[in-house]
From Swiss-Prot:
<keyword id="KW-0800">Toxin</keyword>
<dbReference type="InterPro" id="IPR045860">
    <property type="entry name" value="Snake_toxin-like_sf"/>
</dbReference>
<dbReference type="InterPro" id="IPR018354">
    <property type="entry name" value="Snake_toxin_con_site"/>
</dbReference>
<dbReference type="GO" id="GO:0090729">
    <property type="term" value="F:toxin activity"/>
</dbReference>
<feature type="disulfide bond">
    <location>
        <begin position="58"/>
        <end position="63"/>
    </location>
</feature>
<feature type="disulfide bond">
    <location>
        <begin position="46"/>
        <end position="57"/>
    </location>
</feature>
<protein>
    <recommendedName>
        <fullName>Weak toxin CM-10</fullName>
    </recommendedName>
</protein>
<comment type="function">
    <text>Binds with low affinity to muscular (alpha-1-beta-1-delta-epsilon/CHRNA1-CHRNB1-CHRND-CHRNE) and very low affinity to neuronal (alpha-7/CHRNA7) nicotinic acetylcholine receptor (nAChR).</text>
</comment>
<dbReference type="GO" id="GO:0005576">
    <property type="term" value="C:extracellular region"/>
</dbReference>
<dbReference type="Pfam" id="PF21947">
    <property type="entry name" value="Toxin_cobra-type"/>
</dbReference>
<feature type="disulfide bond">
    <location>
        <begin position="6"/>
        <end position="11"/>
    </location>
</feature>
<dbReference type="InterPro" id="IPR054131">
    <property type="entry name" value="Toxin_cobra-type"/>
</dbReference>
<feature type="disulfide bond">
    <location>
        <begin position="17"/>
        <end position="42"/>
    </location>
</feature>
<comment type="similarity">
    <text>Belongs to the three-finger toxin family. Ancestral subfamily. Orphan group II sub-subfamily.</text>
</comment>
<keyword id="KW-0964">Secreted</keyword>
<dbReference type="InterPro" id="IPR003571">
    <property type="entry name" value="Snake_3FTx"/>
</dbReference>
<feature type="disulfide bond">
    <location>
        <begin position="3"/>
        <end position="24"/>
    </location>
</feature>
């Protein structure tokens, strides 16, 4: 599995996930509309969202755009 791994809105950096990591995720703070920064990467399970945070998970190459 290959997931995007950079904080910019238009990310092109791919990271090859380790064995056992079968989820790509993207998380961001829903309050910050301008200058939005993302945390993207691989995970074993979908991360739990903190208050006012949005977490999106998927399981195909490059799906965490």
């Amino acid at each position: 599995l290959r997931c995007l791994n950079c904080p910019e809105v238009f990310c092109r950096n791919f990271h090859t996930c380790r064995n056992g990591e079968k989820i790509c995720f993207k998380r961001f703070d829903q309050r910050k509309l301008l200058g939005k920064r993302y945390t993207r990467g691989c995970a074993v399970t979908c991360p739990v969202a903190k208050p006012r945070e949005i977490v999106e998970c998927c399981s195909t190459d490059g799906c965490n755009r």
